[in-house]
Design a protein with these regions (language model features):
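Metal-dependent nuclease catalytic cores that hydrolyze phosphodiester bonds in DNA/RNA
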Residues: 1-183
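Hydrophobic/aromatic-lined pockets within catalytic cores
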Residues: 61-66, 175, 197-200, 231-235
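Conserved catalytic cores of phosphodiester-cleaving nucleases, focusing on short active-site segments
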Residues: 184-209
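Residue-level signal for well-ordered alpha-helical scaffold segments within enzymatic catalytic domains
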Residues: 59-60, 93, 191, 225-229
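Short histidine-centered catalytic/ligand-binding loop motif
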Residues: 43-46, 205-217
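Secondary-structure boundary elements
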Residues: 157-163, 188-195, 231-239
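Coil-to-beta-strand transition motifs
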Residues: 164, 177-181, 188-190, 259-261, ...
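Metal-dependent nuclease catalytic regions and adjoining charged, substrate-binding loops involved
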Residues: 215-220, 225-346
Length: 346
């Protein structure tokens, strides 16, 4: 077993083990899982604008302003540099106005401009100087992220959720020989905190929108799996069978290992221009501590979903192996009434 405090996100995703996302894909269909998994040799991991924005949002909320500024730089605004030479044509015009040669490639033209005036306002150089090799983010996106982060930090009882812990902690363990993995948004000494965004285009009460987001995205499976994985890691910390990778305070690690029962909290933030913030605890029992109480149905549903997906993974791995697509082996059958939603019969 491994707990890694420094693993880059790309390495985590490439690691060949079953994750919660994989379990949820399996519950859609085995082929959905295989196509999106490391087993598919033609899988493409496209770094979309949405993914880039999500990483920036997580960096700011989970790790704070300083950590965000170490990685991201706001792209300069062209309106603040009205005389900037942005295109090749701009530089040619600049050279032509000074009766200097203005033909050649962009690199040749740039060199000629700088030879004429080492302080010439070449836009590419302005951007490079301002960003210093960091990831570039537009000012409007950076402002939106900052407003969202401040909305979370200002909420009583929620603002401390992402403090006094560690962000992006990777866990690796086994379930009866099946390699598993999870990546915790934020690990505290006695709690896991997971940051989620949700949309509310239908303008439902926000608590209803959050609950539907949990159901639609099967977050209850995630809550169960993360708690289960962490408990296995903690037992290994006590017995010495869990390997610790990365820089971590020993006192913090000891506190994690000695916590009898970690709690799990989702922090939800609305993502469509209205940064509402809600926090919900995912717990096994109606009364925290579980002293003889009946488990919450949503917890049991998460447990069942996790183990159903895990069992399906093992069946498909045994039947198909890693190197061919996991096409579902189903026979044709007629529809039955229970295949359809009730509103169809109105």
């Amino acid at each position: 077993m491994i707990i890694d405090f420094n693993m880059p996100e790309s390495e985590y995703h490439a690691y060949p083990a079953l994750s919660v996302s994989g379990v949820k894909d399996l519950l859609v269909s085995p082929l959905d899982f295989w196509v999106r998994s490391w087993m598919n040799p033609e899988k493409e991991d496209k770094d979309t604008d949405a993914k880039k924005l999500g990483r920036a949002y997580h960096k700011r909320v989970l790790e704070g302003v300083e950590a965000f500024q170490e990685v991201y730089a706001i792209k300069p605004n062209k309106a603040d540099h009205e005389d900037a030479l942005v295109t090749c044509e701009d530089m040619r015009d600049w050279l032509n106005a000074r009766k200097l040669p203005h033909s050649g490639s962009k690199a040749e033209i740039t060199k000629r401009v700088l030879q004429a005036d080492c302080n010439a306002p070449i836009w590419d150089l302005i951007v490079a100087e301002k960003t210093e090799g960091k990831e570039i983010i537009s000012s409007d996106k950076a402002e939106s992220i900052e407003l969202a982060a401040r909305a979370i930090e200002a909420q009583p009882g929620i603002g401390e959720s992402f403090k006094d812990g560690r962000a992006e902690v990777s866990l690796f363990w086994e379930e009866d020989g099946t390699p598993m993995k999870s990546r915790l948004d934020y690990l505290k000494s006695a709690a896991i905190v997971d940051l989620k965004t949700f949309s509310n285009s239908l303008r439902k009460p926000v608590d209803v929108a959050v609950s539907q987001a949990v159901a639609n995205n099967k977050y209850h499976i995630q809550g169960y799996a993360y708690l289960r994985g962490l408990e296995k890691i903690k037992k290994g910390l006590v017995t010495g069978s869990t390997k610790v990778i990365g820089d971590v305070d020993e006192a913090f690690l000891e506190a994690v290992a000695n916590t009898k029962r970690h709690r799990f909290f989702f922090v939800f933030q609305q993502a469509d221009g209205v940064p509402n913030v809600l926090a919900r605890e995912f717990r096994e029992f109606e009364t925290y501590g579980g002293l003889g109480m009946t488990p919450n149905a949503y917890y049991t549903a998460g447990e069942n979903g996790f183990h159903t997906g895990l069992a399906l993974y093992r069946q498909c791995m045994e039947f198909f192996g890693k190197h061919k697509p996991w096409h579902p082996m189903t026979k044709p059958r007629p529809f039955v009434d229970t295949d359809f939603p009730m509103w169809m019969f109105d």
